[in-house]
Amino acid sequence: MINVNLISKPKWFVEMNPSGKVPTILYNNQVYYESLAVCDLLDEVFDTSPKLNPESAEEKAKIKMALADFDTVIRHYYTLIRSTKPMEELQEMKEKLENSLKPFELKLLEKLYFNGNSGPGMLDYMIWPWFERLAIVEMFHPDLCQVMNSSMFPKLVTF
């Protein structure tokens, strides 16, 4: 494993992967990049247990749909942190972000992980980093209340 400086990517890395995206792996002389593609490949190629993805095509499709739904969370997150609008509009943006998180709170009502109770799976690993990033909103907008608080999102906060 090689850590790559994302601001100043080494020449060899950009030559290997012109998109410059991470994570990137070289497997069987082929370059693969993007988190989901890399994780899917590793899950299929290496015989590890437990698998990140379920065996059933239907369950895999549900994961892909949930990831597509999570794009709304990501969009609202970036809209909020990049905004220079007045507080009233920031509050509206924050509410949109919180509303986009609500379906994910509901998915966790009866289980510990999106994958179930036995441990995290692909969906858990793909969206977890975004929950860490939510704390950054307060750095950009100190007067805005915490985005993901335990009274509104007890399951997601625990997750």
Task: Please report, for each region that a protein language model flagged, where it lies by residue.
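GST-like domain detector, emphasizing the conserved glutathione-binding G-site
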Residues: 1-119
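General N-terminal targeting signals
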Residues: 16-18, 48-50, 69-70, 137-139, ...
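Extended, well-ordered alpha-helical scaffold segments
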Residues: 92-96, 147-159
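Short basic/hydrophobic patches in alpha-helices and adjacent helix-turn junctions
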Residues: 106, 133-136, 158-159
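GST superfamily/GST-like fold recognition
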Residues: 117-142, 148-154
